[in-house]
Amino acid sequence: MKSRTCFAVVVLLLCPLAGFAQRRPHGKRFKPESIHVFPANLVTVRSDSPLYQVQIMVRTGSADDPAGKEGTAYLVARALIEGGFGLPRKPVTTQALAEITRPWGDAAFPTVLVDKQATTFSVTVPRSAFAEYVRRVLKPMFTQPLWLPKEMDRLRRDTLTDIQSGLRFEDEESLGLLALDNYVFSGTPLAHLARGTVQGLQAITSPDLNGFYKKYYTLGNMNVATTINDQQDLSKLIDALPAGEPLYRPANLRASVVAPGRHVLIITQPNAIATGLHLGYPISLRRSDSDYWPLFVANVFLGLHRDSFGRLYQEIREARGYNYGDYSYIEYAYGRPDFLFPPPTTPRDQQYFSIWARPVGHEYAHFILKAMTAELDRFARQGMTPEEVADAKVKARALYLNYAESVSRQLGYRLDDLFYGMRDQGYLEQMLSRIDAVTAAQVNEAIKKYLQAQNLDYVVVTSEAEGEKLATDIAGDTNVHSKTPAEYHISSPIPPDKQQILDQDKQWAAYPLNIPRANIRVVKAAAMFETAAEP
């Protein structure tokens, strides 16, 4: 007889949410939600919607890919939905699944997001149709995968095309962001794309997929978040998932060590019209750590994602107009450059600090590389004033409504909470009170502890015509070009505020990167993501 987890219900109120609702911006409607927390791997968010939302996070991802078969986690997840499931004599293919789910809306067709340590499936279905949905879709999808050869060939081919054509040559910004995501973790299970590698994808067989599925896809290895509160429907949901216990994990992915010195990977595309710049290094910080919220506030001040508030944006974009934006991060942010607010469900045991400078003109690349490094160095050494911390806290509080704006996002954060061991006091639940409690001393202590500019990994994406030249310039500290006063539209006599910009430019230009040529590699985009090893 299959063992199933028993659920006792505990009700928690999102008190910070209710308090914030009284101070919400004009015109913004936001309803406090109550959350039922089960003493297991299932949480529910109460909703009055006639639709059920279900998110299922499997505690596995590309970090568990077998060596030489990188992409296994990704193909397994995609194949559960698109590789055929159910009875072999009448398989539910992608086309059949679309027909089955069409009466229930587009969101009833399952979607999946695969990251390094988590794979998350999402569906939305009418309450009235849930029993039929479980019977026809959810249960056979998770318990009767068929790995149809034709569908597997299609999924493999599509994924290879995404990497070989799309990512390498058509998406300059994603190329740089994902290359850095790998580069800072060189030599670890995190050092390849969640989608896999070219050679790894080509080597994967159907038995590989089935073995991975049987090992990791068990109820005990899943976290579930849903708007279902009816006990019978909850039982149907749990019964639809494969039985099994949690997987023992001896590996410690928080053990990454920052390599001494500065290292640069320059990736060249045939016809890149601008140069993208990135830097980063691993940090041992999780959302459950006491330093998280002080560093969160600090990062809001330094480089809040897709916002003009941050210092990096103000200095490089607003005051000087070099690019479309400059941002910093204390954890991986999925979906850049597209998402305004990075979505949840990509939790990791090992995170990294990074700065992303959106593409600049080739002639300014060396200068902006110095500028972003110098600004990080200054921030790490000087920290923040009490006034700056106070301003950053106000901005950080304002993010709350965006992070919690939908039930879907709330479910995702609850899954992350389970991953990080924060079930009893979740990320959104504690966000406002923890930000309010942050002091300037705590912020500066966190900056001192986690931020530095001496040991950095850089990823630069530029054109093939610029790659070797830029490597020589960086190593030799030559050809550092900023804009001229005329390009800044500064008239003579120079106003005092504009003189400050020119003076700061001189300091940035003189900032020593001290990167020897031996620490700089130039590789063509066509060589990226071929194997798990560095190109």
Q: Which residues are covered by each model-predicted region?
A:
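Extracytoplasmic
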Residues: 27-32, 37-40, 48-55, 59, ...
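Non-catalytic, conformational "gating/processing" segments within enzyme and secreted inhibitor domains
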Residues: 151, 161, 165-168, 177, ...
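M16/MPP (pitrilysin/insulinase) zinc-metallopeptidase core fold and M16-derived inactive scaffolds
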Residues: 25-27, 55-124, 132, 191-195, ...
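Scaffold signal of the M16-like zinc-metallopeptidase fold and its non-catalytic homologs
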Residues: 166-218, 238, 320, 327, ...
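Acidic/histidine-enriched segments that form metal/cofactor-coordinating
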Residues: 94-212, 257-260, 370, 374, ...
